[in-house]
Amino acid sequence: MRRLRRVLLWTLFGLYCALMLWLLLFRRLGRTMPGEYAALLHTNCNLTPLRTIRSYLLVLRRSSSPTMRRYAVVNLAGNIGMFVPLGVLPPLLWPRLRRLPRLLLSAAAVIAAVEAVQLFTLLGSCDVDDLLLNLLGVLLGWGLLRLFSRGRDAVN
């Protein structure tokens, strides 16, 4: 039974990684706009913490446009929700990642690498707020794992 559980967890993790690579990078291949890299970088990069989050919260508070409100919700919830599995699966697969600081540091490294690829390839946008929201998703996943795990030995 333990072997079946591990195979299932590895399969889920592999599928999750493949889906994330497609969503974050590969679905945008061939869709980058032609133009000067510096100009595109200016519009596709935010290195000011909380700038994007504040703008989405402002849209939710003040906009009467259902489309704009939906876009803000999808972006905020999506950036959090997409990374909940990263707070669940790695701690189940690697005991060393069951401690929150180690998990968050590992997740931050992975997310920063994805953001760097997006920055240099212009496949998507590089946004420090994505890193913050993604880490919030990892934290939420880890908390849910702790909440629903059976026994103290499942997750330290």
What role is predicted for each listed range?
Residues 125-136:
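Non-cytosolic membrane-interface motifs at loop->transmembrane helix junctions
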Residues 134-144:
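C-terminal or internal capping secondary-structure element at the end of a domain, subdomain, or sheet
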